[in-house]
């Protein structure tokens, strides 16, 4: 009997020793509270990972990545957003990334952050997602991303750089993916021109910028729901229109001919514009920065509740670097671009000089504009 006991003890020891470190961590994560995970895989930017595993965990759970605003933290977004409570109701896991930078804005300006597997914050967040899928046997068709302000900017970037990971996204008061691009490759840089709504282009240009963040990708892309307030003085309301243009361009929708516009939806003074099953814009009249999180509407958009769109996304055409003239400006008869017009960028064959009084300003490597 003693020999049998020793054998059982040895077998148990070997079984525990053979388990991967990640599996060990997953077993130790306490459900029902915010927990930090430190060994989720490659973390090139030093982004912190926090996770909420509900007590009511589904057998094959979904995942919601909830990304905080500037000055925020994972703890602050966990406390100030409804996703943990909704996780208990619907059984999904919430990942709360935390920015590694002073001021805790996200890097949506460097080339590394704006490139699939480029080594920036987006890369680290993607690795959090794949770790969670592996450790919890998550449903890969129910992985979603959302964020507010700087987190909304990163949400757009995640949808552009890692479209294969996400089924849908909600964006609360952000800017288009690539709008904050730094020509000097500044990490976590601020772009006042973009923030103030002065970077204006066409759906084709914006869509091309998003597609170029994952060159060669032709698979499904996440459905996008864009919220913005009409009196936002941090990220000006023009960014709502530019973000909607971007995703209309990605999905091939006619931005100027939406399928429908619904007043007082999802509440009074909110207007919902639907371009197709993959894109909705929600403009909140009288609301500043940021639009409050609409948790139950998010659950419907993500497909956790009835009446939502299917989480099946639509494949898109291969990325292209071709660009077109900005809708905010045009070329004059003398061959120079007017105010707001495009004047440069990869593949640009139009005018490279601006009308008198304006300067051709590099917005990103794909787009320069007369400002």
UniProtKB/Swiss-Prot annotation:
Region (Disordered): 305-335
Alphabetized NCBIfam families for the sequence: esterase_phb
Cited function: Acetylxylan esterase involved in the hydrolysis of xylan, a major structural heterogeneous polysaccharide found in plant biomass representing the second most abundant polysaccharide in the biosphere, after cellulose. Degrades acetylated xylans by cleaving acetyl side groups from the hetero-xylan backbone.
Recorded GO MF terms: acetylxylan esterase activity; cellulose binding
Domain comment, as recorded: Has a modular structure: a carbohydrate esterase catalytic module at the N-terminus, a linker rich in serines and threonines, and a C-terminal carbohydrate-binding module (CBM). The genes for catalytic modules and CBMs seem to have evolved separately and have been linked by gene fusion.
Residue ranges, annotated region (Ser/Thr-rich linker): 305-336
Annotated region described as Catalytic, given as residue ranges: 32-304
Entry's EC annotation: 3.1.1.72
Keyword set, alphabetical order: Carbohydrate metabolism, Cellulose degradation, Glycoprotein, Hydrolase, Polysaccharide degradation, Secreted, Serine esterase, Signal
Organism: Aspergillus fumigatus (strain ATCC MYA-4609 / CBS 101355 / FGSC A1100 / Af293) (Neosartorya fumigata)
Low complexity bias: start-end ranges: 307-335
Pathway recorded for this protein: Glycan degradation; xylan degradation
InterPro entries found in the cross-reference section: AB_hydrolase_fold, Cellulose-bd_dom_fun, Esterase_phb, Plant_Biomass_Hydrol_Est
Protein name per UniProt: Probable acetylxylan esterase A
